[in-house]
From Swiss-Prot:
Part of the ABC transporter complex PstSACB involved in phosphate import. Responsible for energy coupling to the transport system. It comes from Streptococcus pyogenes serotype M6 (strain ATCC BAA-946 / MGAS10394). The lineage of its organism: Bacteria, Bacillati, Bacillota, Bacilli, Lactobacillales. This is Phosphate import ATP-binding protein PstB 1. Its EC number is 7.3.2.1. One of its GO terms (cellular component) is plasma membrane. Gene3D superfamilies: P-loop containing nucleotide triphosphate hydrolases. Belongs to the ABC transporter superfamily. Phosphate importer (TC 3.A.1.7) family. SUPFAM superfamilies: P-loop containing nucleoside triphosphate hydrolases (SSF52540). ATP binds at G38, P39, S40, G41, S42, G43, K44, S45.
Amino acid sequence: MTEPILQIRDLSVYYNQKKTLKDVSLDLYPNEITALIGPSGSGKSTLLRSINRMNDLNPEVTITGSIVYNGHNIYSPRTDTVDLRKEIGMVFQQPNPFPMSIYENVVYGLHLKGIRDKSILDHAVESSLKGASIWNEVKDRLHDSAVGLSGGQQQRVCIARVLATSPRIILLDEPTSALDPISAGKIEETLLLLKKDYTLAIVTRSMQQASRLSDRTGFFLEGDLLECGPTKAMFMNPKRKETEDYISGKFG
C-alpha cells in the first residue's frame, strides 16, 4: 500500500480556548486529490490552514497534536515555515494576484529565494503557466498586470505562482466558489492534470465537485472528522447517517 505523504494525528485547534477542530487524524496520499466537505464552520478551512501553518498568523490560535511531513512534525520548533510553505502551497477562495505583472506574480516566490537568473525565471514562468493551463492565454502579455485578467484566469495565475516554488502538496480553499461555471470547469480540468505530479487537498461546498475530482473525501461536522474514505464508496454507501444526510442535501 502507498505510504502517505502527510500524516495528521490527533490535531486539535483552539480559537480563544474554544475547540474548533477536535482530535482529527487524516492522511494525504501522493498523486491523489482529497476533498474536505461539510457545512460552514465545520473545521475544513481550519484544517487546511493548519497543514502549512497559516494559523500561526493568528495569535489567538492554539494547536495540539501533530502533522508529520517528510518524517518531521511540522509544528516542531525547528521547522522553517517559509520553506514549509514553499513545499505545501495554498490557493485561496478569492483569486489574489499581486498588483504586478503576470510574470512577476509567477516568479515572486523565486525572488524570495534569491533567484535572479533570467533563464531560470523564464523557464519557471513558462512551465508553471503551462502547468496551470493558462500559458496559451497569456504568453503574449506576460508583462501586463495580472489584476486585469478575468477571475478564472487570475485564479490559474495564482496556481502557477504556487507551482513555481516546486511544491509537493497543494492546498485549495474553495478555489472555484467565486467563479462562473466555465471558469470553474477550467480549474477542475487543471487540478486533474496536476494530480499526476502533486498531492492536492481541496475544501469544497459542491458535492458534485468532490465527486468529480477527489479520490478520497473527509466529512467534517462541528469540528469533528466524522467519516473519511474513498470518495466513490462514501458517496454510494456512507457509513454515518450524518454523512448521508449532508451528501443528499438534507442540511448544509
